[in-house]
């Protein structure tokens, strides 16, 4: 029997896995498996860097497959006209999907004492529940359930029935704490979630970060920063002071993988145009953003897109006057005086509001335009 395994789909997931391992007593570290799914993220050589830290016993790739990889599943998604027939279709889909995914699962999860899964809405959630493997779920992104309750949105209309069929009978699968074999789901802030699942339990990310030693931070940076010299060069640019002793306000723009590439380019051109009047612009692409910002904005300092933004918290003296984003939750940032999350109302100008106003469509209202001042 092995100790524990983390199933990660993004760099942020892996970052939280590092935080959780570093929170353990030193003698218990180095005994976990880090499983990196390539379904929605290309980890490049991150696995090698993560393994080199010695924090994990093994780091393995996971060739997880989306449902459209299996053409035979499409017939189960056809609307049959009423909830009874549609639910029967969904039951068959759930069982079949788990069986089709099985050959691509590289480990025997039953050999692990603890299984931790980020984003169990992905195929791994179907596989674990249909194979009766108990696991701990973790939120996909910081406070992601505050901004988008995916379980309720994806299952709007008779949600209570669908949650029952999943959590009690395991006939279908509903993510984010409603799976029968999901033991619990770890979130950053339960109080901010308007309709929490009974299985949610709170573990603030700040609590994990605040306990890090400098040695711990160095381990994280070793894994997540592939070009330390390049990163330090950007930080030096940010800290530059003019000859008269004055500093130009520094503004960091965090991108998001929004819309189509052409619309996304317009969005961030508009954001840059708005904020470049206030100071010097720096850009940090999202790890899953495929737009080449170095070509769109060749004159602006650019941080490595594969690096989680949280890495910048570990450099003392680094300070931005403003950090701006569209949808990324900024509450984990400590290196800025003002944090601006533009939100849904901003996005209404660029796409049909029905596309991104998911919470509103299920009766959850949130503050659209969020500005936080750090003291």
Task: Describe every region a protein language model picked out.
Residues 2-5:
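Extreme N-terminal starter segment of soluble prokaryotic enzymes
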Residues 7-177, 314, 326-332:
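Active-site and donor-binding regions of nucleotide-sugar-utilizing enzymes
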Residues 39-47, 124-125, 145-146, 260-262, ...:
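Short, charged/polar "capping" segments at the starts of alpha-helices
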Residues 139, 147, 152-249:
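A nucleotide-sugar donor-handling region in carbohydrate enzymes
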Residues 245-259:
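Conserved donor-binding/catalytic core segment of Leloir-type glycosyltransferases
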Residues 255, 276-306:
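Catalytic donor nucleotide-activated moiety binding site of glycosyltransferases and closely related
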Residues 310-355:
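A donor-sugar binding/catalytic signature common to diverse glycosyltransferases
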Residues 355-375:
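Leloir-type glycosyltransferase catalytic cores
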């Amino acid at each position: 029997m092995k100790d524990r395994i983390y199933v990660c789909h993004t760099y942020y997931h892996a970052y939280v896995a590092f935080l959780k391992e570093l929170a353990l007593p030193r003698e218990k570290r180095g005994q976990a498996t880090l499983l990196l799914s390539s379904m929605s993220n290309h980890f490049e050589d991150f696995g090698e860097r993560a393994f080199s830290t010695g924090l994990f016993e093994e780091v393995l790739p996971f060739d997880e497959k989306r449902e459209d990889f299996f053409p035979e599943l499409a017939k189960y998604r056809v609307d049959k006209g009423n909830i009874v027939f549609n639910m029967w279709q969904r039951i068959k889909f759930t069982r079949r999907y788990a069986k089709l995914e099985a050959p691509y699962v590289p480990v025997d999860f039953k050999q692990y004492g603890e299984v931790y899964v980020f984003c169990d809405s992905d195929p791994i959630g179907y596989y674990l529940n249909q194979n009766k493997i108990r696991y701990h779920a973790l939120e996909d992104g910081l406070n992601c359930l505050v901004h988008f309750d995916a379980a309720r949105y994806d299952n709007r209309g008779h949600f209570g029935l669908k949650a029952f069929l999943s959590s009690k009978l395991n006939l279908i699968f509903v993510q984010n704490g409603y799976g029968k074999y999901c033991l619990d789901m770890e979130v950053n802030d339960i109080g901010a979630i308007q309709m929490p699942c009974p299985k949610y339990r709170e573990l603030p990310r700040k609590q994990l970060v605040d306990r890090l030693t400098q040695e711990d931070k160095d381990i994280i940076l070793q894994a997540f920063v592939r070009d330390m010299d390049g990163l330090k060069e950007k930080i030096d640019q940010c800290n530059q002071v003019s000859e008269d002793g004055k500093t130009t306000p520094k503004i960091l723009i965090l991108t998001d993988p929004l819309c189509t590439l052409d619309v996304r380019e317009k969005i961030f051109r508009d954001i840059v145009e708005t904020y470049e009047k206030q100071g010097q612009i720096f850009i940090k692409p999202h790890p899953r953003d495929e737009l080449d910002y170095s070509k769109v904005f060749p004159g602006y300092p650019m941080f490595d897109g594969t690096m989680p933004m949280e890495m910048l918290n570990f450099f003392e003296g680094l300070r931005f006057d403003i950090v701006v984003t569209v949808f990324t939750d900024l509450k984990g940032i400590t290196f800025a005086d003002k944090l601006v999350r533009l939100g849904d109302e901003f996005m209404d100008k660029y796409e049909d509001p029905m596309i991104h106003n998911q919470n509103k469509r299920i009766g959850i209202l949130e503050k659209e335009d969020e500005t936080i001042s750090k003291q």
